[in-house]
């Protein structure tokens, strides 16, 4: 009898409110964040009243401080929720 072991990696997610208001601005910032964090899953929800940014990482913690620094460097207000 063959048994298999499935390793499950934990995923960490950080959620931020932002001042991003346009798709163009979101796409620009996504490019900048993906350059710095190619392994993160990153997306915006601009339909939410807080213009949510979600950042997920599998197997390691999200570097929230660096995400905030990159966003602020590009003139975006951001706050971790």
Where are these regions (language model features)?
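Short amphipathic beta-strand starts and helix->beta connectors
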Residues: 1-3, 35-41
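Short glycine-/aliphatic-rich beta-strand segments at the starts of folded cytosolic domains
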Residues: 4-22
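Short amphipathic alpha-helix segments
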Residues: 20-37
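Short amphipathic alpha-helices in soluble, non-transmembrane regions
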Residues: 29-33, 65-73
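Conserved short beta-strand edge segments in small beta-sheet-based binding/regulatory domains
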Residues: 43, 74-81
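RNA-recognition motif
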Residues: 43-49
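Surface-exposed aromatic
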Residues: 49-55
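Helix N-cap motif at beta-to-alpha junctions
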Residues: 57-62
